[in-house]
């Protein structure tokens, strides 16, 4: 036997292994390329190279199918096809002066309409300018869809204009983030995003649209091959790759697809949990309900919830978007001395209310009270639990649905009237004291409490209030009374300044017949005063910005409003006796289609003494 045979066999075996590894790697690479380029899909689905249709049309069709009536934007080339297509389908496109305003407006529409609010911004800075507004929507649990443009897929990571990793920015802020990879993916991705935004605990979602997904085939082809002339072997390979790339973008693009809304799933209290709460409430002598913003969410109409609360007859404290739920002068609505009431209460229902800073992290609740907590979000449901407070019953479910079920199960229940009237009497005494404080002159300028009482006296029943500011707005929450359900908008737990302009825009579109007021602080006004330009421009077709803005500042902001095409008035100590007359004048100008800014100089009071402004 030849002694070299084992060595030769070993070498041959090694070569075979190397060849197998090489073939395996080559096969994997080819399969990866085939998958990336959708080569198998392209075998069965045609590309219509002559079609002038574009991805923006599909976006508009999906939005229309989901009942979207308004789209807010600051336009840019990356997203122009969406804007054009939406206008053609009758979706109102409203352009703002800042991208954050566009998201705030979408947020307001979501809250007031019960559907998703939509904002569309161009790539890079256009998208990054929305981060604060999207975080605000997340913390306010508002279903907002942000559509952002981006660089073409082929150019990502290669130094294209305004090309950044946008998805990484929004993953911590959004329930769902996605980048669309082909025209055929537009409908399923958007349907999924909109459903996720509204299911369980609502929140914002972000969908990125690369440039080459939105424009027609012939334009994308022209841009891809604009600088390509090579006819070498490598050039032919590159040409094949690029052709396959474009083919994948448009393969099956215009085939029929389902555009209808996907089902929205909501957590609900079980019958056993409701019965457990029935037993607690039926034995209660001093029950209290604290309602938070979650109770205004679909599917329960706010009118049905209001009827439910009135039938239960349990005294209520209202916070956030729930302000106004019981109207202006309900005997069940307790506005003052919440801390003292909670010390006495034997059963407290936290209906969509969170034990965060607004309830002293739960420390405001008595350890003797039986606590029923209801919230869609488990983390919020148990925030600070077993530290400063302890839930007797914790229900992960929709708060409004729970209250309706509780009322149905408590037929014949009557809350002790001495408890209700006692709380209301304390309320009356406190409000009388506030009115007395309002009559005390300040060292300079106007007493803000008196100003707010004047405003409250003149607000019509269809008015809608937007709170955008710090101390002044906190005072307004005690003095000014929202007229009904969903007539008060504030930023929510994030406490964002600058929501006013966007909220007003969205609110006026949803409620064109309402008188919309922004209660501004001087700092918050600075964030959105340029939106007076937006209000003026868009009143041409709908007279939508019939809003009054009440701000407190030392600068001539009323002159700025005039410069932007609106109306402006100054109210100070010199014309204090004309306060109600000026408010009526502002209202009259609004009815004639003019946005109005009432610039009021106010002095200091001790109304919020002891509060820390942070």
Question: Could you say what each language-model-derived stretch is?
Answer:
Residues 69-73, 92-94, 112-151, 290, ...:
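A short, small-residue-rich loop immediately preceding and capping a beta-strand
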Residues 147, 155-164, 302, 339-344, ...:
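Thiamine diphosphate
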Residues 39-47, 220-225, 231-268, 274-275, ...:
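Phosphate/pyrophosphate-binding active-site segments
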Residues 56, 77, 82-84, 426-513:
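Active-site diphosphate/adenylate-binding microenvironment
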Residues 27-39, 58-68, 108-113, 196-201, ...:
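Glycine-rich phosphate/diphosphate-binding loops that line cofactor/substrate pockets in enzymes
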Residues 8, 111, 290-380, 482-514, ...:
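Glycine-rich, anion-gripping cofactor-binding loops and their flanking helix/strand elements
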Residues 4, 17-25, 148-190, 208-215, ...:
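Glycine-rich, acidic loop regions that bind phosphate or pyrophosphate groups
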Residues 4-42:
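Terminal signal-anchor or tail-anchor transmembrane helices
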């Amino acid at each position: 036997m030849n002694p070299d045979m084992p060595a030769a066999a070993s070498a041959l075996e090694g070569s075979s292994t190397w060849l197998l590894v090489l073939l395996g790697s080559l096969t994997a690479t080819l399969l990866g390329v085939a998958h990336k380029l959708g080569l198998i899909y392209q075998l069965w689905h045609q590309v219509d190279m002559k079609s002038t249709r574009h991805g923006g049309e599909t976006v508009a069709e999906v939005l229309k199918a989901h009942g979207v009536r308004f789209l807010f934007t600051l336009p840019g080339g990356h997203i122009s096809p969406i804007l054009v297509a939406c206008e053609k389908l009758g979706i109102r496109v409203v352009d703002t002066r800042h991208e954050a305003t566009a998201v705030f407006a979408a947020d307001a529409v979501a809250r007031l309409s019960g559907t998703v609010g939509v904002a569309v911004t161009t790539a890079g800075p256009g998208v990054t300018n929305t981060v604060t507004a999207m975080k605000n929507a997340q913390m306010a649990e508002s279903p907002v869809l942000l559509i952002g443009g981006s660089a073409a897929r082929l150019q990502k990571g290669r130094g294209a204009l305004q090309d950044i990793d946008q998805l990484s920015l929004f993953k911590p802020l959004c329930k769902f983030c996605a980048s669309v990879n082909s025209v055929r993916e537009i409908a399923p991705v958007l349907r999924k995003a909109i459903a996720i935004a509204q299911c369980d605990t609502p929140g914002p979602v972000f969908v990125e649209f690369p440039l080459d997904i939105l424009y027609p085939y012939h334009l994308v082809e022209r841009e891809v091959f604009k600088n390509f002339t090579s006819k070498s072997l490598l050039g032919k390979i590159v040409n094949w790759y690029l052709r396959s790339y474009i083919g994948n973008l448009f393969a099956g693009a215009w085939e029929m697809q389902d555009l209808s809304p996907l089902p929205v799933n909501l957590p609900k209290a079980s019958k056993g949990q409701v019965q457990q709460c029935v037993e607690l409430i039926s034995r209660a002598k001093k029950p209290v309900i604290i309602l938070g913003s979650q109770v205004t969410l679909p599917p329960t109409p706010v009118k049905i919830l209001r009827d439910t609360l009135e039938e239960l007859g349990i005294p209520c404290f209202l916070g956030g978007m729930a302000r106004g739920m019981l109207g202006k002068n309900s005997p069940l609505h307790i506005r003052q001395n919440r801390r003292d009431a909670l010390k006495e209460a034997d059963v407290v229902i936290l209906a969509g209310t969170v034990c965060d800073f607004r309830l002293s992290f739960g420390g405001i609740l008595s350890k003797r009270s039986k606590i029923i907590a209801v919230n869609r979000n488990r983390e919020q449901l148990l925030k600070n639990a077993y530290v400063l407070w302890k839930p007797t019953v914790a229900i992960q479910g929709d708060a409004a649905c729970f209250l309706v079920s509780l009322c149905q199960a408590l037929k014949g229940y009557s809350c002790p009237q001495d408890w209700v009237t006692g709380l209301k009497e304390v309320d009356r005494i406190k409000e009388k004291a506030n009115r007395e404080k309002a009559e005390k002159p300040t060292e300079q300028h106007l007493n803000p409490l008196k100003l707010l009482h004047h405003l409250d006296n003149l607000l019509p029943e269809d008015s809608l209030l937007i709170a955008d500011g710090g101390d002044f707005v906190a005072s307004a929450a005690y003095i000014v009374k929202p007229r009904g359900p969903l007539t008060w908008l504030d930023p929510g737990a994030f406490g964002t300044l600058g929501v006013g302009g966007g909220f007003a825009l969205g609110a006026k579109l949803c409620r064109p017949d309402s008188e919309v007021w922004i209660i501004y602080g001087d700092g918050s006004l600075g964030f959105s005063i340029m939106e007076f330009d937006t209000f003026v421009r868009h009143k041409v077709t709908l007279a939508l910005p019939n809003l009054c803005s009440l701000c407190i500042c030392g600068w001539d902001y009323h002159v700025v409003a005039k410069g932007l095409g609106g109306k402006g008035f100054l109210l100070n100590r010199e014309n204090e006796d004309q306060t109600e007359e000026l408010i009526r004048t502002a209202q009259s100008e609004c009815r004639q289609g003019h946005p109005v800014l009432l610039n009021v100089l106010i002095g200091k009071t001790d109304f919020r003494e002891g509060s820390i402004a942070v």
